[in-house]
């Protein structure tokens, strides 16, 4: 049965308009993105098949161009459309941060960093560079590693903070496993970075570890 033949309250677009996007499942949201199905499958059925094929919404979004385009019902145009949607989301959060005092907007900071790092297939270490009022100067991805680690050099971070004239920084990195729990190695490198930054009076306000849709704050854990 075509979606247009469904009761109005069950159609994804109508449901979003009346109940808001939070009321929709991953498959329903993806169906809106797809717009149409394929022969024998509605857009919602196709969306469910794609989520099963890639394992999750995260798996679909982080798929390589080749794997994405080979999936039935997708293609290069959809890949480009998806990448543009992701980039718009990231720029939206960056613009929101630039308007707010980052240190006083912990939840907004988490949302931004999750959008930036959650779908990275390998570990990435970055930092938010802030001015004396804790307003965002720039977000930089500094080090890129393997699926379970990235080499981090405090002196390089200090040099970048000086070049950007930052008075404070918020550190961040992702765990590609999806588990955001800080490790002992994370705590050790954070202590080294704090020590290096303090020599030049640059404050490390927090270190956020990003997993699958969540971010754990060192400051909230009392680790900074």
Curated annotation (Swiss-Prot):
One of its GO terms (molecular function) is metallopeptidase activity. The keyword Kinase does not apply. A motif (JAMM motif) lies at residues 173-186. Keywords: Hydrolase, Metal-binding, Metalloprotease, Protease, Zinc. Disulfide bonds: none annotated. GO terms for biological process: proteolysis. Zn(2+) binds at residues 173, 175, 186. It comes from the Bacteria. Pfam families: RadC (PF04002), UPF0758_N (PF20582). Residues 102-224 form the MPN domain. PANTHER family: DNA REPAIR PROTEIN RADC, UPF0758 PROTEIN YEES-RELATED. Belongs to the UPF0758 family. This is UPF0758 protein Patl_0046. It comes from Pseudoalteromonas atlantica (strain T6c / ATCC BAA-1087).
């Amino acid at each position: 049965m075509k979606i247009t033949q469904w009761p109005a309250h069950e159609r994804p677009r109508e449901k979003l308009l009346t109940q808001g996007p939070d009321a929709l499942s991953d498959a329903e949201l993806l169906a809106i993105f797809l717009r149409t199905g394929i022969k024998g499958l509605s857009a919602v059925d196709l969306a469910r098949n794609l989520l099963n094929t890639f394992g999750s919404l995260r798996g679909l979004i982080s798929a390589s161009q080749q794997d994405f385009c080979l999936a039935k019902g997708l293609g290069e145009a959809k890949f480009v459309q998806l990448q543009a949607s992701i980039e718009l989301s990231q720029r939206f959060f960056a613009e929101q941060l630039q308007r707010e005092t980052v240190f006083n907007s912990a939840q907004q900071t988490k949302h931004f960093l999750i959008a930036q790092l959650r779908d990275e297939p390998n570990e990435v270490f970055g930092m938010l560079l802030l001015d004396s009022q804790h307003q965002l100067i720039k977000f930089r991805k500094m080090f890129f590693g393997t699926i379970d680690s990235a080499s981090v050099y405090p002196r390089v971070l200090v040099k970048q903070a000086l070049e950007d004239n930052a008075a404070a920084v918020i550190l961040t990195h992702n765990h590609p496993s999806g588990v955001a729990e800080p490790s002992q190695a994370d705590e050790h490198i954070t202590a080294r970075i704090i020590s290096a930054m303090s020599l030049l009076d640059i404050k490390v306000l927090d270190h956020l570890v990003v997993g699958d849709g969540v971010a754990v704050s060192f400051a909230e854990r009392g680790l900074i």
